[in-house]
Amino acid sequence: EVKTPIIYNKALWETSGHWEHYRENMFLVNSTDGEPMGVKAMNCPGHMLIFKNELRSYRDLPFRLHEQTPLHRNETSGVLTGLTRVRQFAQDDAHCFVTEDQIGEEVERLLRLTQRVFNDFNLKPVMRLSTRPDEYLGQREQWDHAEAQLKSALEAVDAHYTINEGDGA
C-alpha cells in the first residue's frame, strides 16, 4: 500500500495527458510561486512516479501498488447523480505493472479475488468490459490486444459481463 501527495504540479498532469483531457474536472490551485497545480483527481500519475523511481527488470513484474486516499473531482452539475456525483471521495485503487504476456494471468487473478470477496459478502458483481474510445492514447494494436486479454480473463473465470463500447480510458 502506498500514499501519494494530494497536489501535483502542472508538468506531471501534462505528462500524463490529464491536463489536456481532464483539466475541466480538476480543482486547480497555484503554488506560492504562482505555479499551476492540480488537486489529485486520480492516483495514476503518482503510481507511475513510484514505478519509474528506480530501474526495474521484467523480473520485478508484476509490480503492484494499492492506495486508498481522498480524490477530488470538480464535475459539472448534472453529469452524475446521487452518491456517484461527489466532489471528494476515497477510491480503493490499484495499479499493476506487467509484461504484455502477464496481462491475462494478472487480470484473471484479480477477477478471482474480486469474486471471492463478493461471495464472502453474498454480493453479485456487475462487470463491464469498456472498449477503446474514439479518442485514445497508444496504438490501436495495443488496445485490441488488451481488450482480447481482458475478455479472455473474464471468460476464464466464468464472469457475467456486458461490453461498454467506447467507454475505456
Go through the PLM ranges and name each one.
Residues 1-169:
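TRNA-recognition modules of translation machinery and tRNA-sensing kinases, especially anticodon-binding
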